[in-house]
């Protein structure tokens, strides 16, 4: 078996050839091709101009072409232009650095229109005498299913299954990151703690399905009123938090009031009975050392609102304590 194939399978970084064309004149290559056909990966060779000189049958099947028609074609012939940046950038990196490149490529093949993700390993092919990079050999593996599974697991680990908001773990992690940014950039940071009034009575009187409906409505309400650089999550039960970056406490209070009013106006029951919530609002203080400081104050403001008659919002003041 030719040295270049041995090196490619072992993943060695450098391949030296006198001429790429000799690969295809060698009668032994039919045996090598049998091995390439059974690898279950996409194998291809390109010259310095990005023109294909070889592709194994799996790659040809993806491109819906044959070995003869492939010759001289480039990635522009097989992938949509807006998907080529990752592919071409990796090729160029191989040509310029003379080093192997391992990266992920997200591409849509023109043949089937499907978005697939590939883990591509690209090795430079060097001229035996001059050491000039005269092409590359690539081995790509379709990892779409793995990436999708990874994303699903990430969602499961970070998302509340009922409301589809951040769960407690993800919420605290994002809150800590926002806290650090606010301290570093000396920007305001506000927190709204929200709790549905008498939620246990709703579950007891109307059932947990109705309670779930109320929670999901509130989650969608949050998503409809907060901007992209804010985030929210479910702390647990009927308690939620909204974190507003680069936002002063007065602006946060107005947002809390907007949420409270829209929630109170929604008729959850045929009897036209309404459900209410309370919110406590606080902001970053100069001496705060952790998100627990902000959260504690918003929680105190929340329970002051509940003590004062429910269905209201309260900003933390020193007198709140």
Swiss-Prot record:
GO-annotated molecular function: diguanylate cyclase activity; GTP binding; metal ion binding
Keyword list, A-Z: GTP-binding, Magnesium, Metal-binding, Nucleotide-binding, Transferase
Superkingdom, natural source: Bacteria
Any one Gene Ontology cellular component term annotated for this protein: plasma membrane
Domain GGDEF: 187-318
Catalytic activity: 2 GTP = 3',3'-c-di-GMP + 2 diphosphate
Domain PAC: 102-155
EC main group: transferase
Keyword Membrane belongs to the record: no
One record GO biological process: cell adhesion involved in single-species biofilm formation
Cofactor: Mg(2+)
UniProt-annotated binding residues for Mg(2+): 195-196, 238
Positions of the catalytic residues: 238
InterPro entries per record: Diguanylate_Cyclase, GGDEF_dom, Nucleotide_cyclase, PAS, PAS-assoc_C, PAS-like_dom_sf, PAS_4, Rev_trsase/Diguanyl_cyclase
Sequence ranges assigned to domain PAS in this UniProt record: 28-98
Role noted for this protein: Involved in biofilm formation. Catalyzes the conversion of GTP to c-di-GMP.
Free-text note regarding domains: The disordered N-terminal region is not required for diguanylate cyclase activity.
Protein name per Swiss-Prot or TrEMBL: Diguanylate cyclase
Species of the source: Vibrio cholerae serotype O1 (strain ATCC 39541 / Classical Ogawa 395 / O395)
């Amino acid at each position: 078996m030719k040295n270049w194939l041995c090196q490619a399978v072992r993943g060695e970084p450098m391949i030296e050839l006198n001429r790429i064309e000799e690969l295809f004149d060698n009668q032994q290559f039919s045996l090598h091709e049998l091995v390439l056909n059974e690898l279950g990966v996409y194998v291809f060779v390109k010259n310095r101009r990005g023109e294909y000189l070889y592709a194994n049958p799996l790659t040809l099947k993806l491109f819906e072409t044959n070995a003869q028609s492939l010759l001289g074609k480039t990635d522009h012939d097989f992938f949509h232009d807006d998907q080529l940046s990752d592919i071409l950038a990796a090729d160029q990196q191989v040509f310029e650095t003379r080093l192997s490149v391992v990266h992920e490529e997200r591409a849509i093949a023109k043949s089937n229109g499907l978005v697939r993700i590939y883990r591509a390993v690209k090795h430079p092919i060097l001229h035996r005498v001059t050491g000039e990079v005269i092409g590359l050999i690539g081995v790509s593996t379709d990892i779409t299913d793995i990436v999708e599974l990874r994303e699903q697991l990430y969602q499961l680990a970070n998302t509340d299954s009922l409301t589809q908001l951040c769960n407690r773990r993800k919420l605290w992690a994002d809150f800590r990151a926002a806290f650090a940014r606010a301290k570093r950039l000396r920007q305001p940071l506000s927190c709204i703690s929200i709790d549905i009034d008498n939620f246990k009575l709703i579950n007891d009187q109307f059932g947990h399905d109705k309670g779930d409906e109320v929670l999901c409505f509130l989650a969608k309400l949050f998503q409809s009123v907060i901007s992209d650089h804010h985030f929210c999550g479910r702390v647990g039960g009927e308690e939620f938090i909204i974190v507003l970056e680069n936002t002063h406490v007065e602006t946060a209070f107005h947002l809390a009031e907007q949420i409270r009013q829209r929630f109170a106006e929604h008729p959850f029951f045929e009897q036209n009975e309404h459900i209410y919530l309370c919110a406590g609002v606080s902001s970053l203080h100069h001496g705060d050392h952790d998100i627990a400081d902000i959260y504690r104050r918003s929680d105190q403001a929340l329970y002051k609102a509940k003590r004062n008659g429910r269905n209201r919002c309260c900003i933390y003041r020193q007198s709140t304590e």
